[in-house]
Amino acid sequence: MIETPSLAEFYHQQLFADCVPFWFPRAVDEIHGGFLHCFDLDGSLVDDDKSVWAQGRISWMLLTIYQDHERRPEWLTWAESGLKFLTEKCVDFSDGRMFFQVLRDGTPLRKRRYAYSESFAAIAFAAHAAATGSEDSATKARHWFKKFTEWNFLPNNAPPKFTGARPLEALGPRMITLVTAQELELRLGKSADLTHWIDRCIHEIRTLFVKSDLQVVMENVAPDGSISDHFDGRTLNPGHAIEGS
């Protein structure tokens, strides 16, 4: 068994001697801003389309290691390039939501019926607010979190993907709302709204999705928490079970 200090050193080395040097500055798009993220093992670029999720998550990661590890100016500069790209290129101003995928220059390519780009933008702006003291970024973080929760939880906001013949509730929105609210609380401080969402999501995950008798966390359940005995209802995602814990 590897001792805990050895594990800490192992992961530290993997992150800062392997992962970060592979991605940066390779991923930074010096031409259009934001980040490229489709690379082969040898570092060659295999696709230059940009996931909007990735723009938020990469910006968040850079700002997190900037605050928690070392304040390298380039990490902040690169993260701010990602935030600028998100703000200027990734928002559909017809409804205020974000796109899912754009071309390298930011031309919109695809938009999903669900909203997750917004949640990753929220944590990125919250991290920037904490790193720089920017009230504008704090406001944007709260704005995108509100957009995300409204789209996922208010009735009739998202276009239906199924008929009402077999209604299901999904773990995904609760899982991401929980971790997003926790991250905003960490970086921006506690608030009644964030506490509400954290408590609600923990309660719903525990009461609807966790099946202690089966030792599983379901991905989709009936509205009353019962298991739907069909492919969608039997789906398990161990990664989501860990993430929701």
Question: Where is each model-derived feature located?
Answer:
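Glycan-recognition and catalytic cores of secretory/periplasmic carbohydrate-active enzymes
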Residues: 1-245
